[in-house]
């Protein structure tokens, strides 16, 4: 902040690293303890074309990518890279990743809806919970609104031990 206020360069405060493992659009990044979670998304190469002409290729990751980031010295690095693959429940992009405190006190995330189902241009209607132990599809719940990425606020009620999520819009199927 002081660099901005004083009109100095902010470049010394930024670091970056590149890697094919992270070439994802439409996914979300979360962190549980010291592990980062890159959830869902797709690899998109080419020019976007809403008419479906062959100007691009896209490949859904169908994954939760887990890794650690080391910020030592002047270079970033990552380690302990692993993946969880599920082409059914983790085929999500352009969704909301919601930070959660589950009823047992475990911290994690919930994938809220997202697009597109493998055999149709429809959103997923059920969420997927993620913890450090793995993931759980909640197929008994249907989310009919806010299927696409949007602004949101996740609120924890410590008295009643409940999470609440407020979506500020978001495209919907219904």
Where do the language-model regions lie?
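Loop/turn-rich, solvent-exposed surfaces of beta-rich toroidal or solenoidal domains
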Residues: 111-113, 146-174
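Beta-propeller blade signature
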Residues: 1-5, 50-73, 122-136
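Short coil/turn segments that connect the beta-strands within blades of beta-propeller domains
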Residues: 33-34, 106-107, 162-163
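Short loop/turn motifs that recur once per blade in beta-propeller domains
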Residues: 11-24, 84-92, 117, 134-147
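Short, conserved, GDST-rich strand-edge loop motifs in beta-rich repeat architectures
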Residues: 1, 39-59, 113-125, 168-174
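Asp-box/WD-like beta-propeller blade repeats and closely related beta-sheet repeat scaffolds
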Residues: 1-33, 44
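Beta-propeller and closely related beta-sheet repeat lectin domains
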Residues: 25-29, 93-98, 148-156
